[in-house]
Amino acid sequence: MSREEKERLKSLVFKLTGVEVNGLAGLYVYFLLLATAWMEEGGIAAWLIPSEFMDVNYGAALKGYLADQVTLIRAHRFDPDDVQFGDALVSSVVLVFRKTPPPAAHVVEFTFGGSLTEPHARDFIPREKLRESRKWTVYPSHAKNDRHTISDGTGPMLGDFFRVQRGIATGCNKFFVLDRAEAANLGLPDKYLRPILPSPRHLKTTSIDTDDDGYPLIERQLCVIDCNLPEPMVEANYPALWRYLQTAQTLGIRDGHLIGKRTPWYRQEQREPTPFLCTYMGRGANDKQPFRFIWNRSKAIGTNLYLMLYPKENLAAMLNRHPDRAEAVHALLGQVTGHELRGEGRVYGGGLNKIEPSELARISAAPFVELWPEIGADVQSQRKLFG
Protein backbone atom coordinates (compact mmCIF):
# COMPACT_ATOMS: atom_id res chain seq x y z
CA MET A 1 0.00 0.00 0.00
CA SER A 2 1.42 3.38 -0.98
CA ARG A 3 2.08 6.10 1.57
CA GLU A 4 -0.59 8.27 -0.06
CA GLU A 5 -3.20 5.51 0.16
CA LYS A 6 -2.36 4.85 3.81
CA GLU A 7 -2.70 8.57 4.61
CA ARG A 8 -6.07 8.61 2.86
CA LEU A 9 -7.28 5.66 4.90
CA LYS A 10 -5.94 7.14 8.14
CA SER A 11 -7.84 10.35 7.47
CA LEU A 12 -11.03 8.46 6.59
CA VAL A 13 -10.82 6.26 9.69
CA PHE A 14 -10.35 9.30 11.91
CA LYS A 15 -13.26 11.11 10.26
CA LEU A 16 -15.64 8.16 10.69
CA THR A 17 -14.51 6.74 14.04
CA GLY A 18 -12.31 9.31 15.77
CA VAL A 19 -9.55 6.70 15.97
CA GLU A 20 -5.97 7.78 15.17
CA VAL A 21 -4.35 4.72 13.59
CA ASN A 22 -0.59 4.24 13.89
CA GLY A 23 1.14 4.22 10.52
CA LEU A 24 2.69 0.81 11.29
CA ALA A 25 -0.71 -0.87 11.57
CA GLY A 26 -1.66 -3.48 9.00
CA LEU A 27 -4.34 -3.02 6.37
CA TYR A 28 -6.73 -5.24 8.34
CA VAL A 29 -6.93 -2.58 11.09
CA TYR A 30 -8.24 0.01 8.61
CA PHE A 31 -10.59 -2.54 7.07
CA LEU A 32 -12.11 -3.54 10.41
CA LEU A 33 -12.60 0.04 11.57
CA LEU A 34 -14.09 1.27 8.30
CA ALA A 35 -16.38 -1.75 7.97
CA THR A 36 -17.62 -1.26 11.53
CA ALA A 37 -18.38 2.39 10.81
CA TRP A 38 -20.55 1.17 7.92
CA MET A 39 -22.45 -1.29 10.16
CA GLU A 40 -25.89 -0.62 11.58
CA GLU A 41 -26.02 0.30 15.27
CA GLY A 42 -26.51 -2.83 17.35
CA GLY A 43 -25.18 -5.06 14.59
CA ILE A 44 -22.90 -7.97 15.47
CA ALA A 45 -19.60 -8.62 13.70
CA ALA A 46 -17.22 -11.57 13.73
CA TRP A 47 -13.70 -11.12 12.40
CA LEU A 48 -10.78 -13.47 11.83
CA ILE A 49 -7.65 -11.31 11.84
CA PRO A 50 -3.97 -11.50 12.83
CA SER A 51 -3.53 -11.37 16.61
CA GLU A 52 -0.38 -9.24 16.50
CA PHE A 53 -2.32 -6.07 17.33
CA MET A 54 -2.98 -7.53 20.80
CA ASP A 55 0.70 -7.18 21.72
CA VAL A 56 2.23 -4.27 19.86
CA ASN A 57 2.21 -0.52 20.45
CA TYR A 58 0.70 0.18 17.04
CA GLY A 59 -2.26 -2.00 18.00
CA ALA A 60 -3.23 0.35 20.83
CA ALA A 61 -5.76 2.23 18.70
CA LEU A 62 -7.67 -0.94 17.80
CA LYS A 63 -7.54 -2.24 21.37
CA GLY A 64 -8.88 1.08 22.61
CA TYR A 65 -11.67 0.96 20.06
CA LEU A 66 -12.65 -2.58 21.04
CA ALA A 67 -12.59 -1.73 24.74
CA ASP A 68 -14.36 1.63 24.62
CA GLN A 69 -16.47 2.11 21.49
CA VAL A 70 -18.01 -1.30 20.87
CA THR A 71 -19.08 -4.17 23.10
CA LEU A 72 -16.43 -6.84 22.70
CA ILE A 73 -18.18 -10.13 23.39
CA ARG A 74 -15.45 -12.68 22.79
CA ALA A 75 -11.85 -12.98 21.65
CA HIS A 76 -10.66 -16.46 20.69
CA ARG A 77 -6.95 -16.77 19.99
CA PHE A 78 -5.75 -19.89 18.22
CA ASP A 79 -2.68 -21.65 19.56
CA PRO A 80 0.25 -20.22 17.54
CA ASP A 81 1.63 -23.75 17.18
CA ASP A 82 -1.58 -24.71 15.39
CA VAL A 83 -1.14 -22.80 12.12
CA GLN A 84 -4.51 -21.92 10.58
CA PHE A 85 -3.25 -21.07 7.09
CA GLY A 86 -0.77 -23.21 5.22
CA ASP A 87 0.66 -20.30 3.25
CA ALA A 88 1.06 -17.75 6.07
CA LEU A 89 2.86 -17.98 9.39
CA VAL A 90 0.45 -15.69 11.18
CA SER A 91 -1.12 -16.02 14.61
CA SER A 92 -4.89 -15.59 14.48
CA VAL A 93 -7.74 -14.33 16.63
CA VAL A 94 -11.50 -14.35 16.18
CA LEU A 95 -13.21 -11.22 17.49
CA VAL A 96 -16.96 -11.04 18.10
CA PHE A 97 -18.46 -7.69 19.05
CA ARG A 98 -21.67 -5.68 18.93
CA LYS A 99 -21.70 -2.16 17.56
CA THR A 100 -22.90 -0.47 20.71
CA PRO A 101 -21.05 1.16 23.62
CA PRO A 102 -20.10 -1.33 26.35
CA PRO A 103 -22.32 -1.47 29.44
CA ALA A 104 -20.97 -0.68 32.88
CA ALA A 105 -18.96 -3.49 34.48
CA HIS A 106 -18.78 -5.33 31.15
CA VAL A 107 -16.66 -8.49 31.00
CA VAL A 108 -15.18 -10.07 27.88
CA GLU A 109 -14.84 -13.79 27.24
CA PHE A 110 -11.27 -14.70 26.26
CA THR A 111 -10.59 -18.21 24.98
CA PHE A 112 -7.43 -19.88 23.76
CA GLY A 113 -6.44 -22.93 21.73
CA GLY A 114 -8.50 -25.77 20.35
CA SER A 115 -11.49 -24.58 18.35
CA LEU A 116 -14.15 -21.93 18.73
CA THR A 117 -16.59 -24.48 20.09
CA GLU A 118 -14.06 -26.41 22.19
CA PRO A 119 -11.31 -24.06 23.39
CA HIS A 120 -8.54 -25.27 25.67
CA ALA A 121 -8.92 -22.38 28.12
CA ARG A 122 -11.51 -19.75 28.99
CA ASP A 123 -11.59 -16.69 31.22
CA PHE A 124 -13.75 -13.60 31.66
CA ILE A 125 -11.80 -10.36 31.79
CA PRO A 126 -13.33 -7.09 33.05
CA ARG A 127 -13.27 -4.35 30.46
CA GLU A 128 -11.47 -2.01 32.86
CA LYS A 129 -8.67 -4.55 33.19
CA LEU A 130 -8.36 -4.75 29.41
CA ARG A 131 -8.12 -0.98 29.16
CA GLU A 132 -5.08 -1.06 31.46
CA SER A 133 -3.38 -4.06 29.82
CA ARG A 134 -0.54 -3.49 27.35
CA LYS A 135 -0.78 -7.03 26.00
CA TRP A 136 -3.99 -8.94 25.54
CA THR A 137 -2.35 -12.24 24.62
CA VAL A 138 -1.74 -12.96 28.32
CA TYR A 139 -5.47 -13.85 28.55
CA PRO A 140 -6.61 -16.46 29.37
CA SER A 141 -4.01 -18.14 31.57
CA HIS A 142 -3.15 -21.61 30.28
CA ALA A 143 -0.16 -23.95 30.28
CA LYS A 144 0.35 -23.40 26.54
CA ASN A 145 -0.45 -19.69 26.71
CA ASP A 146 2.67 -19.10 28.80
CA ARG A 147 2.95 -15.37 28.25
CA HIS A 148 3.44 -13.67 31.61
CA THR A 149 4.79 -10.18 32.19
CA ILE A 150 6.49 -9.46 35.51
CA SER A 151 7.44 -5.81 35.16
CA ASP A 152 4.63 -3.36 35.84
CA GLY A 153 6.63 -0.40 34.63
CA THR A 154 7.43 0.90 38.11
CA GLY A 155 10.27 -1.35 39.27
CA PRO A 156 13.74 -1.61 37.75
CA MET A 157 13.78 -2.79 34.14
CA LEU A 158 16.54 -3.85 31.76
CA GLY A 159 16.07 -0.56 29.95
CA ASP A 160 17.26 1.24 33.09
CA PHE A 161 20.64 -0.47 32.81
CA PHE A 162 21.01 -1.18 29.09
CA ARG A 163 20.45 0.81 25.93
CA VAL A 164 18.92 -1.80 23.64
CA GLN A 165 19.47 -1.35 19.90
CA ARG A 166 19.03 -3.56 16.86
CA GLY A 167 22.17 -4.70 15.07
CA ILE A 168 23.00 -3.40 11.63
CA ALA A 169 20.97 -3.97 8.48
CA THR A 170 23.49 -4.18 5.64
CA GLY A 171 20.93 -4.34 2.85
CA CYS A 172 22.60 -7.47 1.45
CA ASN A 173 24.52 -9.72 3.81
CA LYS A 174 25.59 -11.99 0.95
CA PHE A 175 27.56 -9.11 -0.56
CA PHE A 176 28.78 -7.10 2.43
CA VAL A 177 29.49 -9.93 4.89
CA LEU A 178 32.42 -12.20 3.97
CA ASP A 179 34.52 -14.89 5.54
CA ARG A 180 37.61 -13.27 7.01
CA ALA A 181 39.82 -15.59 4.97
CA GLU A 182 37.95 -14.73 1.75
CA ALA A 183 38.36 -11.00 2.40
CA ALA A 184 42.10 -11.56 2.88
CA ASN A 185 42.33 -13.54 -0.37
CA LEU A 186 40.61 -10.69 -2.20
CA GLY A 187 43.09 -8.23 -0.74
CA LEU A 188 40.42 -6.12 0.97
CA PRO A 189 41.97 -3.60 3.41
CA ASP A 190 41.59 -4.51 7.09
CA LYS A 191 40.84 -0.91 8.06
CA TYR A 192 37.54 -1.07 6.17
CA LEU A 193 36.48 -4.46 7.53
CA ARG A 194 34.75 -4.97 10.87
CA PRO A 195 34.30 -8.25 12.75
CA ILE A 196 30.66 -9.33 12.76
CA LEU A 197 28.87 -12.27 14.34
CA PRO A 198 27.31 -15.00 12.20
CA SER A 199 23.58 -15.61 12.12
CA PRO A 200 22.33 -16.91 15.51
CA ARG A 201 21.61 -20.33 14.01
CA HIS A 202 25.32 -20.64 13.18
CA LEU A 203 26.49 -19.39 16.58
CA LYS A 204 26.74 -22.43 18.82
CA THR A 205 27.97 -20.71 21.99
CA THR A 206 26.68 -18.02 24.33
CA SER A 207 30.16 -17.04 25.54
CA ILE A 208 32.55 -15.59 22.97
CA ASP A 209 36.30 -15.10 23.48
CA THR A 210 38.45 -12.90 21.28
CA ASP A 211 41.67 -13.21 19.32
CA ASP A 212 44.37 -10.53 19.25
CA ASP A 213 42.67 -8.72 16.35
CA GLY A 214 39.29 -8.51 18.06
CA TYR A 215 37.70 -11.28 16.00
CA PRO A 216 35.56 -13.78 17.90
CA LEU A 217 37.18 -17.15 18.56
CA ILE A 218 34.52 -19.15 16.76
CA GLU A 219 34.63 -21.64 13.92
CA ARG A 220 33.66 -19.19 11.19
CA GLN A 221 35.06 -15.68 11.49
CA LEU A 222 33.18 -13.09 9.46
CA CYS A 223 33.74 -9.45 8.58
CA VAL A 224 31.55 -6.72 7.11
CA ILE A 225 32.66 -4.11 4.59
CA ASP A 226 32.30 -0.66 6.14
CA CYS A 227 34.03 2.23 4.38
CA ASN A 228 33.30 5.95 4.57
CA LEU A 229 35.54 7.06 1.69
CA PRO A 230 33.93 8.45 -1.48
CA GLU A 231 34.23 6.27 -4.57
CA PRO A 232 37.04 8.26 -6.28
CA MET A 233 39.26 7.83 -3.20
CA VAL A 234 38.50 4.11 -3.00
CA GLU A 235 39.34 3.70 -6.69
CA ALA A 236 42.62 5.62 -6.33
CA ASN A 237 43.86 4.11 -3.07
CA TYR A 238 42.26 0.68 -2.62
CA PRO A 239 42.02 -1.06 -6.01
CA ALA A 240 41.09 -4.46 -4.56
CA LEU A 241 38.16 -3.00 -2.64
CA TRP A 242 37.18 -0.97 -5.69
CA ARG A 243 37.12 -4.07 -7.90
CA TYR A 244 34.93 -5.90 -5.41
CA LEU A 245 32.50 -2.99 -5.10
CA GLN A 246 32.11 -2.86 -8.88
CA THR A 247 30.54 -6.33 -8.84
CA ALA A 248 27.55 -4.88 -6.97
CA GLN A 249 26.30 -3.18 -10.11
CA THR A 250 26.03 -6.37 -12.16
CA LEU A 251 24.40 -8.17 -9.22
CA GLY A 252 21.76 -5.46 -8.92
CA ILE A 253 22.65 -4.82 -5.29
CA ARG A 254 22.82 -1.05 -5.59
CA ASP A 255 19.14 -0.94 -6.53
CA GLY A 256 18.10 -1.99 -3.01
CA HIS A 257 16.05 0.49 -0.99
CA LEU A 258 18.30 0.55 2.07
CA ILE A 259 21.55 0.67 0.10
CA GLY A 260 20.23 3.42 -2.13
CA LYS A 261 19.70 5.71 0.86
CA ARG A 262 23.30 5.50 2.11
CA THR A 263 26.19 7.83 1.28
CA PRO A 264 28.43 6.23 0.27
CA TRP A 265 26.31 3.18 -0.45
CA TYR A 266 28.86 0.79 1.14
CA ARG A 267 28.92 2.66 4.48
CA GLN A 268 27.16 0.67 7.22
CA GLU A 269 25.09 1.82 10.17
CA GLN A 270 27.45 2.63 13.01
CA ARG A 271 27.46 0.33 16.04
CA GLU A 272 30.09 -0.08 18.69
CA PRO A 273 30.84 -3.58 19.98
CA THR A 274 28.96 -4.45 23.16
CA PRO A 275 29.61 -7.17 25.74
CA PHE A 276 26.00 -8.39 25.68
CA LEU A 277 23.62 -9.31 22.88
CA CYS A 278 20.29 -11.07 22.59
CA THR A 279 18.99 -13.02 19.62
CA TYR A 280 15.97 -11.34 18.05
CA MET A 281 13.83 -14.40 17.29
CA GLY A 282 13.54 -18.01 18.37
CA ARG A 283 11.38 -20.78 19.71
CA GLY A 284 10.89 -22.21 23.16
CA ALA A 285 8.15 -23.38 25.51
CA ASN A 286 7.67 -23.39 29.27
CA ASP A 287 10.84 -22.19 31.03
CA LYS A 288 13.05 -22.52 27.95
CA GLN A 289 14.16 -19.11 26.74
CA PRO A 290 13.09 -18.45 23.14
CA PHE A 291 16.01 -16.01 22.82
CA ARG A 292 19.67 -16.44 23.78
CA PHE A 293 21.79 -13.91 25.62
CA ILE A 294 25.38 -13.71 24.38
CA TRP A 295 28.45 -12.63 26.37
CA ASN A 296 30.73 -11.07 23.77
CA ARG A 297 34.37 -10.34 24.62
CA SER A 298 35.36 -9.68 21.01
CA LYS A 299 35.01 -6.53 18.90
CA ALA A 300 32.36 -8.12 16.71
CA ILE A 301 29.07 -6.35 16.18
CA GLY A 302 25.79 -8.02 15.24
CA THR A 303 23.40 -7.92 12.31
CA ASN A 304 19.75 -7.03 12.82
CA LEU A 305 19.13 -10.63 13.90
CA TYR A 306 20.56 -9.53 17.25
CA LEU A 307 19.63 -6.93 19.83
CA MET A 308 22.70 -5.19 21.23
CA LEU A 309 22.66 -4.35 24.95
CA TYR A 310 24.92 -1.41 25.82
CA PRO A 311 25.42 -0.94 29.59
CA LYS A 312 24.20 2.46 30.78
CA GLU A 313 25.87 4.79 33.27
CA ASN A 314 25.52 2.97 36.61
CA LEU A 315 26.05 -0.52 35.24
CA ALA A 316 28.85 0.62 32.93
CA ALA A 317 30.65 2.32 35.83
CA MET A 318 30.35 -0.82 37.94
CA LEU A 319 31.73 -2.99 35.14
CA ASN A 320 34.63 -0.59 34.66
CA ARG A 321 35.47 -0.92 38.35
CA HIS A 322 34.78 -4.65 38.48
CA PRO A 323 35.28 -6.21 35.00
CA ASP A 324 34.98 -9.66 36.55
CA ARG A 325 31.27 -9.00 37.18
CA ALA A 326 30.46 -9.20 33.46
CA GLU A 327 30.09 -12.94 33.81
CA ALA A 328 27.53 -12.44 36.59
CA VAL A 329 25.62 -9.94 34.43
CA HIS A 330 25.44 -12.55 31.67
CA ALA A 331 24.27 -15.14 34.19
CA LEU A 332 21.45 -12.86 35.39
CA LEU A 333 20.33 -12.28 31.81
CA GLY A 334 20.28 -16.03 31.36
CA GLN A 335 17.93 -16.35 34.33
CA VAL A 336 15.14 -14.31 32.73
CA THR A 337 12.35 -16.83 32.32
CA GLY A 338 11.02 -17.98 29.00
CA HIS A 339 7.54 -17.03 30.23
CA GLU A 340 8.53 -13.39 30.70
CA LEU A 341 10.44 -13.16 27.43
CA ARG A 342 7.44 -14.52 25.53
CA GLY A 343 5.12 -12.26 27.52
CA GLU A 344 6.97 -9.11 26.56
CA GLY A 345 7.58 -10.20 22.96
CA ARG A 346 5.16 -11.33 20.29
CA VAL A 347 4.41 -14.73 18.77
CA TYR A 348 3.72 -15.75 15.18
CA GLY A 349 2.14 -18.77 13.56
CA GLY A 350 4.17 -21.91 14.05
CA GLY A 351 5.35 -20.74 17.48
CA LEU A 352 8.06 -18.32 16.30
CA ASN A 353 8.74 -15.64 18.91
CA LYS A 354 10.24 -12.20 18.30
CA ILE A 355 11.19 -9.40 20.65
CA GLU A 356 11.87 -5.75 19.83
CA PRO A 357 14.28 -3.42 21.69
CA SER A 358 11.51 -1.62 23.59
CA GLU A 359 10.00 -4.95 24.65
CA LEU A 360 13.29 -6.37 25.89
CA ALA A 361 13.88 -3.11 27.76
CA ARG A 362 10.69 -3.72 29.77
CA ILE A 363 11.93 -7.01 31.26
CA SER A 364 12.26 -6.83 35.04
CA ALA A 365 15.79 -6.10 36.29
CA ALA A 366 14.98 -6.59 39.97
CA PRO A 367 17.64 -9.35 40.35
CA PHE A 368 20.32 -6.87 39.22
CA VAL A 369 19.39 -4.41 41.95
CA GLU A 370 19.12 -7.16 44.55
CA LEU A 371 22.68 -8.27 43.78
CA TRP A 372 24.15 -4.78 43.31
CA PRO A 373 21.95 -2.22 45.14
CA GLU A 374 24.31 0.61 44.23
CA ILE A 375 23.40 0.51 40.53
CA GLY A 376 19.72 1.07 41.26
CA ALA A 377 20.18 4.02 43.60
CA ASP A 378 18.84 6.74 41.28
CA VAL A 379 17.00 4.70 38.65
CA GLN A 380 13.57 6.16 39.40
CA SER A 381 14.79 9.76 39.40
CA GLN A 382 16.68 9.20 36.12
CA ARG A 383 13.58 7.67 34.54
CA LYS A 384 11.47 10.68 35.56
CA LEU A 385 14.13 13.08 34.30
CA PHE A 386 14.70 11.47 30.91
CA GLY A 387 11.36 9.75 30.40
Please report, for each region that a protein language model flagged, where it lies by residue:
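Polybasic, glycine- and aromatic-enriched phosphate-binding surface used to engage nucleic acids
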Residues: 146-386
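Signature of N6-adenine DNA methyltransferases within the class I
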Residues: 1-176
